[in-house]
């Protein structure tokens, strides 16, 4: 599945990977404007912690499922990654706005989804409940997208949401 969509870096001679796999997202940015960072943040909308970004290879996502994950969880993760792939394709084929889509605006916290104003070209439902398993067991992220560089340099925001 992943080798035919995202691409996998570092497979063995038989095409298998070890306990982790590195998804190659480098070409996506050139084709669609979508980065590995956008995918990682969109995973939060699906209830997953963002994977390791750009290590050991820049422009990639390192996925490390553990032995303790159930088959249902692994199958659900595959469904999530397939759905995110479809969202990327919507940007690529022009059916989703390149500047205003579920990926570049992820994650979508509850306070944004339920706000009176919604200024996006996609629905609140697509932002918050993209697949049925999320509807059944939603984990809301507490904050919207944060500027990564600023967040790394100014680790503690003020209570008014501005970095000092």
Predicted feature descriptions by range:
Residues 1-164:
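Non-catalytic terminal extensions of PLP-dependent enzymes
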